Amino acid sequence: MAAATVGVLLRLLLLPVVVVVSLLVGASRAANVTYDHRAVVIDGVRRVLVSGSIHYPRSTPDMWPGLIQKSKDGGLDVIETYVFWDIHEAVRGQYDFEGRKDLVRFVKAVADAGLYVHLRIGPYVCAEWNYGGFPVWLHFVPGIKFRTDNEAFKAEMQRFTEKVVDTMKGAGLYASQGGPIILSQIENEYGNIDSAYGAAGKAYMRWAAGMAVSLDTGVPWVMCQQSDAPDPLINTCNGFYCDQFTPNSKSKPKMWTENWSGWFLSFGGAVPYRPAEDLAFAVARFYQRGGTFQNYYMYHGGTNFGRSTGGPFIATSYDYDAPIDEYGMVRQPKWGHLRDVHKAIKLCEPALIAAEPSYSSLGQNTEATVYQTADNSICAAFLANVDAQSDKTVKFNGNTYKLPAWSVSILPDCKNVVLNTAQINSQVTTSEMRSLGSSIQDTDDSLITPELATAGWSYAIEPVGITKENALTKPGLMEQINTTADASDFLWYSTSIVVKGDEPYLNGSQSNLLVNSLGHVLQIYINGKLAGSAKGSASSSLISLQTPVTLVPGKNKIDLLSTTVGLSNYGAFFDLVGAGVTGPVKLSGPNGALNLSSTDWTYQIGLRGEDLHLYNPSEASPEWVSDNAYPTNQPLIWYKTKFTAPAGDDPVAIDFTGMGKGEAWVNGQSIGRYWPTNLAPQSGCVNSCNYRGAYSSNKCLKKCGQPSQTLYHVPRSFLQPGSNDLVLFEQFGGDPSMISFTTRQTSSICAHVSEMHPAQIDSWISPQQTSQTQGPALRLECPREGQVISNIKFASFGTPSGTCGNYNHGECSSSQALAVVQEACVGMTNCSVPVSSNNFGDPCSGVTKSLVVEAACS
């Protein structure tokens, strides 16, 4: 390689460092961000960028720096976030950018870490967020029609978009000002549904593009899932795979704004997850096929605090099986394996930005892509096996390569494989749930649970029916969202009838009451007592509840409590999707029926306890009763207790097992809706999900037949030294003595590396040079600062089987394995053990061997 070529290569390799340094310098110089057909271009240099979504209101300001640093350590260049209109302008014209809503602080935190920002303004965001991120007051603007060529909507959308842009400009946060924002997005996945709006939809889309460009941010704008996005906007791809995506112009780069790292959880659904091997395969295929910007949706999902969930029926946890979990801990092996993929991609960056891809077939379902400069000085290659069943052996550049099914091998020098997406070098972490001496294995959470059974509880009864002076009486049944404006989840429908005893809808004192509702949850009370309840689901929120009721001579009171569980957030005209009791409401018996749908109904928005702010411990209320014999398993009741925060700095959650459905507040801050009685279906889950073959949201599910969510995150910043307050509103009935606080702890770290694995990616210092001559190695590292490897629970070199926490020796096993690993690892914060017969002896010649280790840290 000529000296000049080496110099160019070194400059390209050092470019990310230069960018990081420039961002960390206080008032950084302005950057010129453009694009060409290959990549985003920053100050004249094409960049291969890896991005990840972190939504600022789904975590806390105290968590942001750690989340961002873990993202950087995982190999990200960019943090992507939506902007959530509803939290910033809950009341029209009154803006809020404080606390978890402090967008400027979040963007500055990203800049402080030396990363870029992609700001997705929308302002429609979907995001499984309540009403798609729109404030509900927008629905009541006269003459408005959402997301179409409607002047009222466009005026409001432009006003808020300008507010966001002006706020960013005012803080100097665009790259054109020396800030970290290099990209912005207008609208969101509109192309998925724009056909429903006809010509007006196309006109609106073009208007939105023009409006965005006119704001003069100095950085490119994108539209995702919009194949006809007009120039200069870049149309981008969202999905599980985007390697086959092509931009709508030869002048635009191939960009992937949402690579779904898992899937969201719904109340009543099983827990979805996406294997690390498949996610890595999708990423590598995208860069192989010409992509240069890829974003994980989500990289950290976080928590839907308060009433922010959309859906309806989106769960409070927005973990998303992301590389950083809901609590801010790295999820292994996903985080580590993707980190290795990113390092491999970055080793290829000089070739990816300097050359056009050249594709060739290596046989059935196998493909080589080469990026090579005209003078052959720089070359990188990707070898893919897209067969979902069979491993392949291929010839490339005179060498033989083995390609596992559904995998990509990355060769930064067109010769040496530094990574194969199906071969994980990263460690696995497991945990266990310990509760008062019992121990249950769990692959996600380790939770030490001090019970609240002996805590002193106060309670307050929430009255049934109408108690407020501002109640409204009208004939007929009113749609819920138009009535409440989403001020509360709850709307009471109340009426009464007089019974003589000979009515045709009676059978003695019995009758059947039928209530039809758009959802989402319905409870029927007759004369103050619960007579029946029903719920919809994520697939259909509709309710048709028929329940036997007992009526008494004289006046009978009928109270219906309709409850929303997040407003619709996706689809054409999603803003018009209603909720609440629509009728008929009908009493029926053997000789006739009485339709109550058109009678006078009295409506009350929200609960008495909400008006009294019972969730706020700083506001005293005479409603609270302190009694050791507090009621349990009773609907419509508030509970309150005091607790001391769990010691240490481990992430905290509350286990709501034993409760029904409700909402919880810690020191006055809502940690979200809880619903541990909503169970996943009994079927559809798999013990081990095969990563090979196309992934879908229902392919890999776990926890069938179990509650969708029992653990609810309490950020440490919500807690205070000494005494803390926990308040619950319980809608269905439960026993608060069964509630427990939990802290998340890792119990084991494991790794499984074979002789066929590439060497650790960290051993490569350039596309052509490795710092070591050794082959594959097994690496372990304790997850927390200050920990050391204290115990080797299992070690086997040969043909071991099983999974972390449940390994077994195979027929072939080295007798030296445990001693060798103990010598290398015990007492160390991290260790690396060569996977070679030279290290362990050869227990079975001619057989491909693996090293498996399970260790504990303390």
From Swiss-Prot:
Keywords: Apoplast, Glycoprotein, Glycosidase, Hydrolase, Secreted, Signal. InterPro entries: BetaGal_gal-bd, Galactose-bd-like_sf, GHD, Gly_Hdrlase_35_cat, Glyco_hydro_35_CS, Glycoside_Hdrlase_35, Glycoside_hydrolase_SF, Lectin_gal-bd_dom. The active site is at E189 (proton donor), E258 (nucleophile). Its EC number is 3.2.1.23. The keyword Signal applies. This is Beta-galactosidase 6. Glycans are attached at N32, N259, N482, N507, N595, N830. Residues 1-30 form the signal peptide. It is found in: Secreted, Extracellular space, Apoplast. It is an enzyme of class 3 (hydrolase). The keyword Signal applies. Optimum pH is 3.5. One of its GO terms (biological process) is galactose catabolic process. Pfam families: BetaGal_gal-bd (PF21467), GHD (PF17834), Glyco_hydro_35 (PF01301), SUEL_Lectin (PF02140). Belongs to the glycosyl hydrolase 35 family. Residues 772-858 form the SUEL-type lectin domain. It comes from the Eukaryota. Releases galactose by hydrolysis of plant cell wall galactose-containing polysaccharides such as galacto-xyloglucan, pectic galactan and galactan (in vitro). It catalyses: Hydrolysis of terminal non-reducing beta-D-galactose residues in beta-D-galactosides. GO terms for cellular component: apoplast; plant-type cell wall; vacuole. GO terms for molecular function: beta-galactosidase activity; carbohydrate binding.
